[in-house]
Amino acid sequence: MQAFLKGTSISTKPPLTKDRGVAASAGSSGENKKAKPVPWVEKYRPKCVDEVAFQEEVVAVLKKSLEGADLPNLLFYGPPGTGKTSTILAAARELFGPELFRLRVLELNASDERGIQVVREKVKNFAQLTVSGSRSDGKPCPPFKIVILDEADSMTSAAQAALRRTMEKESKTTRFCLICNYVSRIIEPLTSRCSKFRFKPLSDKIQQQRLLDIAKKENVKISDEGIAYLVKVSEGDLRKAITFLQSATRLTGGKEITEKVITDIAGVIPAEKIDGVFAACQSGSFDKLEAVVKDLIDEGHAATQLVNQLHDVVVENNLSDKQKSIITEKLAEVDKCLADGADEHLQLISLCATVMQQLSQNC
Protein backbone atom coordinates (compact mmCIF):
# COMPACT_ATOMS: atom_id res chain seq x y z
CA MET A 1 0.00 0.00 0.00
CA GLN A 2 2.83 2.42 0.89
CA ALA A 3 4.58 1.57 -2.37
CA PHE A 4 1.39 2.42 -4.24
CA LEU A 5 1.00 5.76 -2.44
CA LYS A 6 4.59 6.77 -3.22
CA GLY A 7 3.72 7.04 -6.90
CA THR A 8 0.78 9.37 -6.28
CA SER A 9 0.43 12.91 -5.05
CA ILE A 10 -2.40 14.05 -2.83
CA SER A 11 -4.03 17.29 -3.96
CA THR A 12 -4.54 19.84 -1.20
CA LYS A 13 -6.70 22.13 -3.38
CA PRO A 14 -10.37 22.30 -2.43
CA PRO A 15 -12.70 20.58 -4.89
CA LEU A 16 -14.27 22.71 -7.59
CA THR A 17 -17.72 23.61 -6.40
CA LYS A 18 -20.71 23.77 -8.68
CA ASP A 19 -20.87 27.55 -8.39
CA ARG A 20 -17.20 27.97 -9.26
CA GLY A 21 -17.64 25.67 -12.25
CA VAL A 22 -20.59 27.70 -13.46
CA ALA A 23 -18.63 30.93 -12.99
CA ALA A 24 -15.69 29.53 -14.92
CA SER A 25 -17.89 28.39 -17.78
CA ALA A 26 -19.68 31.74 -17.79
CA GLY A 27 -16.35 33.55 -17.96
CA SER A 28 -15.16 31.46 -20.88
CA SER A 29 -18.43 31.95 -22.75
CA GLY A 30 -18.15 35.69 -22.14
CA GLU A 31 -14.70 35.67 -23.71
CA ASN A 32 -16.05 33.73 -26.69
CA LYS A 33 -18.84 36.26 -27.14
CA LYS A 34 -16.36 39.11 -27.34
CA ALA A 35 -16.75 40.82 -30.68
CA LYS A 36 -14.18 39.70 -33.20
CA PRO A 37 -12.48 42.35 -35.35
CA VAL A 38 -14.16 42.45 -38.75
CA PRO A 39 -12.85 44.17 -41.90
CA TRP A 40 -14.82 47.36 -42.39
CA VAL A 41 -15.53 46.33 -45.98
CA GLU A 42 -17.64 43.46 -44.61
CA LYS A 43 -18.93 45.34 -41.57
CA TYR A 44 -20.41 48.15 -43.67
CA ARG A 45 -21.46 46.07 -46.68
CA PRO A 46 -25.10 46.91 -47.60
CA LYS A 47 -27.48 44.63 -45.71
CA CYS A 48 -30.51 45.46 -47.87
CA VAL A 49 -31.18 46.72 -51.38
CA ASP A 50 -32.15 50.20 -50.15
CA GLU A 51 -28.61 50.72 -48.83
CA VAL A 52 -27.06 50.29 -52.30
CA ALA A 53 -25.89 53.69 -53.51
CA PHE A 54 -25.98 55.28 -56.97
CA GLN A 55 -27.34 52.26 -58.92
CA GLU A 56 -30.98 53.23 -59.40
CA GLU A 57 -31.86 50.91 -62.32
CA VAL A 58 -30.75 47.63 -60.77
CA VAL A 59 -32.20 48.61 -57.37
CA ALA A 60 -35.59 49.24 -59.02
CA VAL A 61 -35.57 45.78 -60.67
CA LEU A 62 -34.55 44.02 -57.45
CA LYS A 63 -37.23 45.86 -55.46
CA LYS A 64 -39.87 44.58 -57.88
CA SER A 65 -38.65 41.02 -57.34
CA LEU A 66 -38.79 41.55 -53.57
CA GLU A 67 -42.41 42.62 -53.97
CA GLY A 68 -43.27 39.35 -55.72
CA ALA A 69 -42.26 39.80 -59.36
CA ASP A 70 -40.13 37.12 -61.02
CA LEU A 71 -36.35 37.61 -61.02
CA PRO A 72 -34.57 37.22 -64.38
CA ASN A 73 -31.05 35.93 -64.90
CA LEU A 74 -28.76 38.88 -64.21
CA LEU A 75 -25.46 40.15 -65.58
CA PHE A 76 -23.77 42.88 -63.52
CA TYR A 77 -20.74 44.58 -65.05
CA GLY A 78 -18.71 47.66 -64.24
CA PRO A 79 -15.55 48.88 -62.48
CA PRO A 80 -14.39 47.20 -59.24
CA GLY A 81 -15.68 48.56 -55.95
CA THR A 82 -19.02 49.83 -57.29
CA GLY A 83 -21.22 47.37 -55.37
CA LYS A 84 -21.94 44.53 -57.82
CA THR A 85 -21.43 41.62 -55.41
CA SER A 86 -22.86 43.53 -52.44
CA THR A 87 -26.07 44.26 -54.37
CA ILE A 88 -26.94 40.68 -55.26
CA LEU A 89 -25.97 39.40 -51.78
CA ALA A 90 -28.19 42.04 -50.15
CA ALA A 91 -31.07 41.10 -52.45
CA ALA A 92 -30.60 37.38 -51.72
CA ARG A 93 -30.66 38.01 -47.97
CA GLU A 94 -33.90 39.94 -48.29
CA LEU A 95 -35.45 37.31 -50.57
CA PHE A 96 -34.60 34.24 -48.51
CA GLY A 97 -33.96 35.52 -45.00
CA PRO A 98 -31.00 34.49 -42.80
CA GLU A 99 -32.25 30.90 -42.34
CA LEU A 100 -32.54 29.92 -46.01
CA PHE A 101 -29.77 32.13 -47.39
CA ARG A 102 -27.04 29.48 -47.12
CA LEU A 103 -29.31 26.79 -48.58
CA ARG A 104 -30.58 28.82 -51.51
CA VAL A 105 -27.42 30.69 -52.63
CA LEU A 106 -24.27 29.26 -54.24
CA GLU A 107 -21.44 31.78 -54.66
CA LEU A 108 -18.32 31.04 -56.69
CA ASN A 109 -15.55 33.57 -57.29
CA ALA A 110 -12.13 33.69 -58.94
CA SER A 111 -10.48 31.84 -56.04
CA ASP A 112 -12.59 28.75 -56.81
CA GLU A 113 -11.89 26.28 -59.57
CA ARG A 114 -14.47 27.14 -62.20
CA GLY A 115 -13.55 25.12 -65.24
CA ILE A 116 -15.95 23.12 -67.34
CA GLN A 117 -15.93 20.26 -64.81
CA VAL A 118 -17.20 22.53 -62.00
CA VAL A 119 -20.00 23.86 -64.21
CA ARG A 120 -21.00 20.33 -65.14
CA GLU A 121 -20.90 19.00 -61.58
CA LYS A 122 -21.09 21.55 -58.75
CA VAL A 123 -23.26 24.18 -60.44
CA LYS A 124 -25.44 21.62 -62.19
CA ASN A 125 -25.98 19.55 -59.02
CA PHE A 126 -26.89 22.66 -57.00
CA ALA A 127 -29.29 23.82 -59.72
CA GLN A 128 -31.04 20.43 -59.76
CA LEU A 129 -31.76 20.47 -56.00
CA THR A 130 -35.44 20.78 -55.18
CA VAL A 131 -36.56 23.95 -53.45
CA SER A 132 -38.33 23.49 -50.13
CA GLY A 133 -38.88 25.30 -46.86
CA SER A 134 -40.51 28.55 -45.87
CA ARG A 135 -39.35 31.59 -43.95
CA SER A 136 -39.88 31.59 -40.20
CA ASP A 137 -40.99 35.23 -40.23
CA GLY A 138 -43.94 34.42 -42.48
CA LYS A 139 -42.76 36.50 -45.43
CA PRO A 140 -43.18 34.98 -48.91
CA CYS A 141 -40.16 33.04 -50.16
CA PRO A 142 -39.55 32.76 -53.92
CA PRO A 143 -39.51 29.22 -55.38
CA PHE A 144 -36.00 29.37 -56.80
CA LYS A 145 -32.30 29.34 -55.88
CA ILE A 146 -29.58 31.80 -56.93
CA VAL A 147 -26.16 30.92 -58.35
CA ILE A 148 -23.69 33.85 -58.15
CA LEU A 149 -20.67 33.59 -60.45
CA ASP A 150 -18.37 36.42 -59.39
CA GLU A 151 -15.64 37.56 -61.80
CA ALA A 152 -17.29 35.51 -64.55
CA ASP A 153 -15.04 37.14 -67.16
CA SER A 154 -12.18 34.95 -65.88
CA MET A 155 -14.09 31.75 -66.71
CA THR A 156 -12.89 29.81 -69.73
CA SER A 157 -14.95 29.96 -72.92
CA ALA A 158 -15.63 26.22 -72.61
CA ALA A 159 -17.00 26.67 -69.08
CA GLN A 160 -19.19 29.56 -70.23
CA ALA A 161 -20.49 27.47 -73.12
CA ALA A 162 -21.31 24.59 -70.75
CA LEU A 163 -23.27 27.02 -68.59
CA ARG A 164 -25.74 27.84 -71.39
CA ARG A 165 -27.62 24.55 -71.28
CA THR A 166 -27.72 24.52 -67.47
CA MET A 167 -29.28 28.00 -67.43
CA GLU A 168 -32.01 26.83 -69.81
CA LYS A 169 -32.77 23.43 -68.25
CA GLU A 170 -32.93 24.70 -64.65
CA SER A 171 -34.81 27.93 -65.36
CA LYS A 172 -37.79 26.80 -63.26
CA THR A 173 -35.81 26.43 -60.03
CA THR A 174 -32.61 28.48 -60.45
CA ARG A 175 -31.60 32.03 -61.32
CA PHE A 176 -28.04 32.95 -62.31
CA CYS A 177 -26.23 36.20 -61.55
CA LEU A 178 -22.99 36.72 -63.49
CA ILE A 179 -20.67 39.45 -62.21
CA CYS A 180 -17.73 40.80 -64.20
CA ASN A 181 -15.62 43.87 -64.88
CA TYR A 182 -15.50 43.43 -68.67
CA VAL A 183 -18.75 42.38 -70.35
CA SER A 184 -16.90 41.88 -73.66
CA ARG A 185 -15.28 38.75 -72.17
CA ILE A 186 -18.64 37.05 -71.67
CA ILE A 187 -19.77 34.99 -74.67
CA GLU A 188 -22.81 36.33 -76.53
CA PRO A 189 -25.07 33.29 -75.88
CA LEU A 190 -24.77 33.98 -72.12
CA THR A 191 -25.33 37.74 -72.34
CA SER A 192 -28.46 37.16 -74.43
CA ARG A 193 -29.92 35.01 -71.64
CA CYS A 194 -29.41 37.69 -68.95
CA SER A 195 -30.72 41.13 -68.12
CA LYS A 196 -27.62 43.34 -68.27
CA PHE A 197 -26.99 46.12 -65.76
CA ARG A 198 -24.01 48.45 -65.90
CA PHE A 199 -22.78 49.62 -62.51
CA LYS A 200 -21.70 53.23 -62.84
CA PRO A 201 -18.52 54.45 -61.13
CA LEU A 202 -19.46 56.04 -57.82
CA SER A 203 -19.27 59.83 -57.76
CA ASP A 204 -16.71 61.47 -55.48
CA LYS A 205 -19.51 63.04 -53.43
CA ILE A 206 -21.18 59.69 -52.68
CA GLN A 207 -17.86 58.07 -51.78
CA GLN A 208 -16.93 60.95 -49.48
CA GLN A 209 -20.31 60.78 -47.73
CA ARG A 210 -19.97 57.02 -47.20
CA LEU A 211 -16.43 57.36 -45.83
CA LEU A 212 -17.48 60.20 -43.50
CA ASP A 213 -20.31 58.02 -42.13
CA ILE A 214 -17.88 55.17 -41.43
CA ALA A 215 -15.33 57.55 -39.88
CA LYS A 216 -18.01 58.96 -37.58
CA LYS A 217 -19.19 55.50 -36.45
CA GLU A 218 -15.61 54.32 -35.83
CA ASN A 219 -14.51 57.60 -34.14
CA VAL A 220 -11.82 58.21 -36.77
CA LYS A 221 -10.15 61.62 -36.80
CA ILE A 222 -9.88 62.74 -40.43
CA SER A 223 -10.58 66.07 -42.13
CA ASP A 224 -12.77 66.65 -45.18
CA GLU A 225 -9.58 67.28 -47.17
CA GLY A 226 -8.22 63.94 -46.00
CA ILE A 227 -11.41 62.18 -47.13
CA ALA A 228 -11.21 63.89 -50.53
CA TYR A 229 -7.58 62.78 -50.93
CA LEU A 230 -8.55 59.23 -49.89
CA VAL A 231 -11.19 59.14 -52.63
CA LYS A 232 -8.65 60.43 -55.15
CA VAL A 233 -6.00 57.78 -54.45
CA SER A 234 -8.58 54.96 -54.42
CA GLU A 235 -9.51 55.84 -58.04
CA GLY A 236 -13.27 55.37 -57.70
CA ASP A 237 -13.02 52.02 -55.87
CA LEU A 238 -15.03 52.42 -52.65
CA ARG A 239 -13.90 49.03 -51.35
CA LYS A 240 -10.28 50.11 -51.69
CA ALA A 241 -11.02 53.45 -50.00
CA ILE A 242 -12.64 51.76 -46.98
CA THR A 243 -9.70 49.36 -46.67
CA PHE A 244 -7.24 52.28 -46.80
CA LEU A 245 -9.26 54.10 -44.13
CA GLN A 246 -9.17 51.11 -41.78
CA SER A 247 -5.44 50.55 -42.36
CA ALA A 248 -4.68 54.23 -41.72
CA THR A 249 -6.73 54.12 -38.50
CA ARG A 250 -4.73 51.14 -37.22
CA LEU A 251 -1.47 52.86 -38.16
CA THR A 252 -2.20 56.19 -36.46
CA GLY A 253 -3.61 54.63 -33.29
CA GLY A 254 -6.33 57.23 -32.71
CA LYS A 255 -4.42 60.27 -33.99
CA GLU A 256 -5.64 62.34 -36.93
CA ILE A 257 -5.14 60.76 -40.35
CA THR A 258 -3.09 63.01 -42.63
CA GLU A 259 -2.47 62.94 -46.37
CA LYS A 260 1.05 61.60 -45.73
CA VAL A 261 -0.37 58.60 -43.84
CA ILE A 262 -2.82 57.90 -46.68
CA THR A 263 0.01 58.19 -49.22
CA ASP A 264 2.08 55.63 -47.29
CA ILE A 265 -0.86 53.24 -46.88
CA ALA A 266 -2.01 53.45 -50.51
CA GLY A 267 1.46 52.98 -51.98
CA VAL A 268 1.14 56.25 -53.87
CA ILE A 269 4.36 57.91 -54.98
CA PRO A 270 4.63 61.35 -53.29
CA ALA A 271 3.86 64.28 -55.59
CA GLU A 272 7.33 65.76 -55.09
CA LYS A 273 8.89 62.53 -56.43
CA ILE A 274 6.74 62.70 -59.57
CA ASP A 275 7.66 66.36 -59.99
CA GLY A 276 11.31 65.33 -59.64
CA VAL A 277 10.96 62.81 -62.48
CA PHE A 278 9.30 65.43 -64.68
CA ALA A 279 11.98 68.00 -63.79
CA ALA A 280 14.71 65.49 -64.69
CA CYS A 281 13.02 64.97 -68.06
CA GLN A 282 12.92 68.72 -68.62
CA SER A 283 16.61 69.10 -67.70
CA GLY A 284 17.73 67.20 -70.79
CA SER A 285 20.40 65.34 -68.77
CA PHE A 286 20.15 61.58 -69.27
CA ASP A 287 22.50 60.91 -66.32
CA LYS A 288 20.25 62.90 -63.99
CA LEU A 289 17.18 61.11 -65.34
CA GLU A 290 18.74 57.68 -64.81
CA ALA A 291 19.70 58.59 -61.23
CA VAL A 292 16.14 59.72 -60.40
CA VAL A 293 14.61 56.53 -61.85
CA LYS A 294 17.14 54.36 -59.98
CA ASP A 295 16.31 56.11 -56.70
CA LEU A 296 12.58 55.50 -57.22
CA ILE A 297 13.10 51.79 -57.84
CA ASP A 298 15.55 51.46 -54.92
CA GLU A 299 12.94 53.04 -52.61
CA GLY A 300 10.52 50.26 -53.55
CA HIS A 301 7.99 52.25 -55.56
CA ALA A 302 6.01 50.21 -58.10
CA ALA A 303 6.75 50.99 -61.73
CA THR A 304 3.06 50.62 -62.64
CA GLN A 305 2.19 53.25 -60.03
CA LEU A 306 4.69 55.66 -61.60
CA VAL A 307 3.15 55.03 -65.02
CA ASN A 308 -0.35 55.84 -63.71
CA GLN A 309 0.70 59.00 -61.90
CA LEU A 310 2.91 60.19 -64.76
CA HIS A 311 -0.09 59.81 -67.05
CA ASP A 312 -2.10 62.24 -64.88
CA VAL A 313 0.76 64.76 -64.93
CA VAL A 314 1.09 64.56 -68.72
CA VAL A 315 -2.65 64.98 -69.31
CA GLU A 316 -2.81 68.07 -67.07
CA ASN A 317 0.37 69.61 -68.53
CA ASN A 318 0.31 72.35 -71.17
CA LEU A 319 1.92 70.18 -73.85
CA SER A 320 0.55 70.08 -77.39
CA ASP A 321 -1.98 67.40 -78.31
CA LYS A 322 0.58 65.68 -80.54
CA GLN A 323 3.15 65.53 -77.72
CA LYS A 324 0.54 64.16 -75.31
CA SER A 325 -0.55 61.49 -77.80
CA ILE A 326 3.05 60.31 -78.33
CA ILE A 327 3.75 60.15 -74.58
CA THR A 328 0.46 58.41 -73.70
CA GLU A 329 1.03 55.85 -76.46
CA LYS A 330 4.44 55.12 -74.93
CA LEU A 331 2.79 54.89 -71.49
CA ALA A 332 0.44 52.23 -72.85
CA GLU A 333 3.32 50.25 -74.37
CA VAL A 334 5.31 50.36 -71.12
CA ASP A 335 2.25 49.34 -69.10
CA LYS A 336 1.77 46.31 -71.35
CA CYS A 337 5.46 45.37 -71.13
CA LEU A 338 5.38 45.61 -67.33
CA ALA A 339 2.30 43.39 -67.24
CA ASP A 340 4.21 40.85 -69.33
CA GLY A 341 7.09 40.85 -66.82
CA ALA A 342 9.62 43.17 -68.46
CA ASP A 343 12.46 44.78 -66.47
CA GLU A 344 11.12 47.79 -64.54
CA HIS A 345 14.33 49.84 -64.73
CA LEU A 346 14.69 49.53 -68.50
CA GLN A 347 11.00 50.26 -69.15
CA LEU A 348 10.99 53.39 -66.98
CA ILE A 349 14.21 54.65 -68.60
CA SER A 350 12.63 54.10 -72.02
CA LEU A 351 9.46 55.92 -70.96
CA CYS A 352 11.26 58.89 -69.42
CA ALA A 353 13.53 59.17 -72.47
CA THR A 354 10.43 59.54 -74.65
CA VAL A 355 9.05 62.20 -72.28
CA MET A 356 12.43 64.01 -72.37
CA GLN A 357 12.44 63.91 -76.18
CA GLN A 358 8.98 65.48 -76.39
CA LEU A 359 9.70 68.11 -73.73
CA SER A 360 12.87 69.15 -75.55
CA GLN A 361 10.72 70.28 -78.48
CA ASN A 362 9.28 73.05 -76.30
CA CYS A 363 12.72 74.57 -75.78
UniProtKB/Swiss-Prot annotation:
Residue list for modification N-acetylmethionine: 1
Start and end residues of each stretch annotated as Disordered: 1-36
Compartments in which it is found: Nucleus
Cross-referenced Pfam families: AAA, RCF1-5-like_lid, Rep_fac_C
Presence of keyword Nucleotide-binding: yes
Coiled coil: none
MF terms in GO: ATP binding; ATP hydrolysis activity; DNA binding; enzyme binding
Main location: nucleus
GO cellular component, one term: Ctf18 RFC-like complex
Binding site for ATP: 78-85
Modified residues (N6-acetyllysine): 6, 13
Superkingdom per UniProt: Eukaryota
Keyword tags: Acetylation, ATP-binding, Deafness, DNA replication, Nucleotide-binding, Nucleus
Biological process, per Gene Ontology: DNA repair; DNA strand elongation involved in DNA replication; DNA-templated DNA replication; positive regulation of DNA-directed DNA polymerase activity
Xref: InterPro entries: AAA+_ATPase, ATPase_AAA_core, DNA_pol3_clamp-load_cplx_C, DNA_Rep/Repair_Clamp_Loader, P-loop_NTPase, Rep_factorC_C, RFC_lid
Subunit details: Subunit of the RFC complex, an heteropentameric complex consisting of a large subunit RFC1 and four small subunits RFC2, RFC3, RFC4 and RFC5; the RFC complex interacts with PCNA. Forms an heterotetrameric complex with RFC2, RFC3 and RFC5; this complex has ATPase activity but is not stimulated by PCNA. The heterotetramer of subunits RFC2, RFC3, RFC4 and RFC5 interacts with RAD17. Interacts with ATAD5. Interacts with CTF18. Interacts with CNTD1; this interaction facilitates crossover formation.
Disease connection: Morimoto-Ryu-Malicdan neuromuscular syndrome: An autosomal recessive neuromuscular disorder characterized by delayed gross motor development, gait disturbances, incoordination, muscle weakness, hearing impairment, and decreased body weight. Some patients are wheelchair bound and death in infancy or childhood may occur.
PANTHER family: REPLICATION FACTOR C / DNA POLYMERASE III GAMMA-TAU SUBUNIT, REPLICATION FACTOR C SUBUNIT 4
Family to which this protein belongs: Belongs to the activator 1 small subunits family.
Chain's role: Subunit of the replication factor C (RFC) complex which acts during elongation of primed DNA templates by DNA polymerases delta and epsilon, and is necessary for ATP-dependent loading of proliferating cell nuclear antigen (PCNA) onto primed DNA. The RFC4 subunit probably functions as a scaffold on which the other complex components can assemble.
Leftover remarks: Despite of the presence of a putative ATP-binding motif, this protein does not bind ATP.
Protein name according to UniProt: Replication factor C subunit 4
Organism per entry: Homo sapiens (Human)
Gene expressing this chain: RFC4
